[in-house]
Amino acid sequence: ATMLSKVSPNWHIDMFERLEGAGIESSNENNNAGTGHAALCELNYTVEQDDGSIDASKAQEINEQFELSRQFWGNLVKNGDISNPEEFIQPLPHISFVMGPTNVNFLRKRYETLRTIPMFDNIEYTEDMETMRKWMPLMMENREPGHQMAASKIDEGTDVNYGALTRKLAHYLEQKSNVSLKYNH
């Protein structure tokens, strides 16, 4: 609705929500992981092919979509349509962690593939226990050597509070004369 109100300001937009407000259910911060869904740590966006290679095309597509979202949100902030972006987006490293030889081999191949793609070229990879302790101290606490483990990390990840973002976007829309938000519908 926000994008439509921008590109077609003469349209009248009715937005319906079953609940009593915006950002209460699926986008609420208690119900959404908030990783930004930029394909930095979500392993399911990189698929191992029958020949053992890694197909990263879905990861590239997802990352491009997320970057477009960030640009859109940045434009809304720049134009004063929404404020205080720190309330809905924070920088946060994205880490993938795996255990077992099959998973470690997959993560290593994923790393080798992603680091050749400009949008992922800052990815780091380790099988070193001490490095993993630095990257994720709570997760590695009391973990004993002897199990094959690996991790990858991209420092430029984000944490998105989709509940806060949704409420900000709804507040913006409530100020628009061509938009009608209908709650409890």
Regions found by a protein language model. Give the residues of each.
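Short, hydrophobic/amphipathic alpha-helical packing segments
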Residues: A1, F66-G74, T166-A170
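Short, intrinsically disordered, charge-balanced linker/junction segments flanking boundaries
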Residues: A1, H12, A22, S180-H185
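Glycine-rich FAD pyrophosphate-binding loop
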Residues: S5-E29
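Active-site-adjacent bridging/hinge elements
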Residues: H12-D14, M140-G146
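Short hydrophobic segments within beta-strands
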Residues: F16, F97-V98, D155
